[in-house]
Amino acid sequence: MASAQALKFRAAGHARQKLWGILVRKERWALSWRGWLIVLAGVSLTFYVFLSGIYPFLAVTHRVNSNILVVEGWIHEYAIRAAVEEFQSNSYERVFTTGGPVVGIGGYINDYQTSASVGAELLKKDGLANEFVQMVPSRVMDRDRTYGSAVALRNWFREHNMPVHSINVVTEDLHTRRTRLLFKKALGHDVAVGVIAVANPDYDSTHWWRYSEGVKDVFSEGAAYLYAKFLFNPSMSSRDEKTVVRNAVNSKP
């Protein structure tokens, strides 16, 4: 009778206690080997989808119909050469380079010590005529540089009364999706933004996880995209840009 009552007690989901409730014994469900096999298969599938899908997700190429090419000035020379080929192979009329102060100089000094200026000179060196190239420097560095560069481009269009309905932006592979997101935020819904990803020739993008540089690039750009997508505040960035500009003006002799 007592054994039957104990079984009934446990079947009802009650715990057994000893030592005045200090020790408790409970029955619980646990995964069987079949259950663990299913969990392992699910984890493996998720991991495979991540490895095979994250790179093409970040390094997206999607051109729009446009006669304006934008080149992020900080990109490496292999990407600059790809931008020159893109310009010469299509019906572009102008190419704009963007970017803030060159890394390592401690902040904005003048427009000619910016990534926009460096990128413009590299485009000319690789064969583009001066008449096609226009640098659009930004004074923003450190935080939200891509958005600051896009805002500087938007302001240049407005100041020069240049109506723009679409652009294509050349940048480096894993930065592309974030570039499109931030340029869209800066330029607004009336401007279609296309992007062109230039692959890093130093590693095989289809097996990026085999290379330390590939792992670093994927995780850093993935985290940066999540920040831009869910945490970035354009109004805060605009206030920071105004502060940088004001400080640069005040520092002039």
Protein language model regions, located:
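N-terminal type II signal-anchor transmembrane helix
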Residues: 21-60
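A structural signal for short, hydrophobic/glycine-enriched beta-strand patches
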Residues: 56-210
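A transmembrane-helix-recognition feature enriched in membrane-embedded lipid enzymes
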Residues: 211-238
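N-terminal Lys/Arg-rich, disordered targeting/topogenic segments
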Residues: 1-31
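Extracytoplasmic/luminal low-complexity segments enriched in Pro/Gly and acidic/polar residues
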Residues: 238-253
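Membrane-helix interfacial "entry" motifs
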Residues: 28-31, 209, 213
